[in-house]
Amino acid sequence: MNETPRVRKPASERRAEIMQAADAEFAANGLAGTRIEAIAARVGVSHPRIVQMFGSKRSLFMEVMHATFDRIEAVFAEAEPTLVGLGDAYRRLLRSERTVGLVMLQAYAAAADEAVREEARRRQLDLQESIARLTGADGLQVRTFFATGLVMTVSDLLELPEQRADAAWSAWILERAAPPDGD
């Protein structure tokens, strides 16, 4: 029997593949519902290999969560430094990378786990500080922006009819997060 020998991939490449598979699995099933075996099967590695690389399912989930926050921070850093500019960039990210919104919601859903809650809280606060720094927004404006972002995330993921059919609705929501003229 002639079997094709498996080609060993560099650890960094394998790690990236596992992160991509974990992103999809955690987005779909959350921390509690995801099985490491499902991630391993997507990549063609063993369960022990994933544990060897990441330590635990929770650690892998937190790395995926951090990567999601990093993607949001990266699009904000490149966006027009206004609340509307950041909101537009976030909406484009949600639509181009569906797992972003799903992983964020799964992170909030996993907040009963103290370690996840602490990391999600820290990253959320860091993101709020970044928004204030980038835009000059005050605390109320940042909180309004986050509330608006959560509405956008849920609306986009649920494909609410008014979200899809009425672009003016999105513009109206983003306007609510914009600072008043003259500030």
Describe each region flagged by the PLM.
Residues 17-24, 28, 42, 52, ...:
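Alpha-helical structural segments
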Residues 1-5, 12-38:
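Short, amphipathic alpha-helix enriched in basic
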Residues 48:
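Key DNA-contact positions within bacterial/archaeal DNA-binding proteins
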Residues 56-59, 99:
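Residue-level recognition of oxygen-bearing side chains
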Residues 1-13, 174-183:
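Actinobacteria-biased recognition of intrinsically disordered, low-complexity terminal regions
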Residues 75, 83-105, 110-118:
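Helical hydrophobic small-molecule/effector-binding pocket
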Residues 13-14, 45, 56:
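The short coil/loop that forms the "turn" connecting the two helices of the helix-turn-helix
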Residues 113-125, 131-183:
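Hydrophobic/aromatic-rich alpha-helical bundle segments in the mid-to-C-terminal region
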